[in-house]
């Protein structure tokens, strides 16, 4: 469920805007999406793990807020991010 350091570094490198960017909305959404996908796989194996399900819902809400912020600030970056991550919005 937690991302390994090399996985996290690879995601940051793929979505960063400049060389020292680690906190832009694009990077945050990409990291959250990876964590969400990991939790979804965990819940397929352990469907009664309600604590993890609550954590998943919190992560989805945080990602939704970040995507709404990005959509209001930069539509082109929003659309590019949605396409690259394969999200349905």
UniProtKB/Swiss-Prot annotation:
Coiled coil: none annotated. It holds the Pfam family Ribosomal_S15. Keywords: Ribonucleoprotein, Ribosomal protein, RNA-binding, rRNA-binding. It comes from the Bacteria. InterPro entries: Ribosomal_uS15, Ribosomal_uS15_bac-type, uS15_NS1_RNA-bd_sf. One of its GO terms (molecular function) is rRNA binding. PROSITE patterns: RIBOSOMAL_S15. CDD domains: Ribosomal_S15p_S13e. One of its GO terms (cellular component) is cytosolic small ribosomal subunit. GO terms for biological process: translation. One of the primary rRNA binding proteins, it binds directly to 16S rRNA where it helps nucleate assembly of the platform of the 30S subunit by binding and bridging several RNA helices of the 16S rRNA. Forms an intersubunit bridge (bridge B4) with the 23S rRNA of the 50S subunit in the ribosome. Belongs to the universal ribosomal protein uS15 family. NCBIfam families: S15_bact (TIGR00952). Part of the 30S ribosomal subunit. Forms a bridge to the 50S subunit in the 70S ribosome, contacting the 23S rRNA. This is Small ribosomal subunit protein uS15. It comes from Roseiflexus castenholzii (strain DSM 13941 / HLO8).
């Amino acid at each position: 469920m937690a991302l390994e350091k090399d996985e996290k570094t690879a995601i940051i490198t793929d979505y960063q805007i400049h060389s020292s960017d680690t906190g832009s909305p694009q990077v945050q959404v990409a990291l959250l999406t990876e964590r969400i996908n990991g939790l979804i796989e965990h819940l397929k194996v352990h469907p009664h793990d309600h604590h993890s399900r609550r954590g998943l819902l919190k992560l989805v809400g945080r990602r939704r807020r970040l995507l709404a912020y990005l959509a209001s600030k930069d539509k082109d970056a929003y659309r590019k991010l949605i396409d690259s991550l394969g999200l349905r919005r």
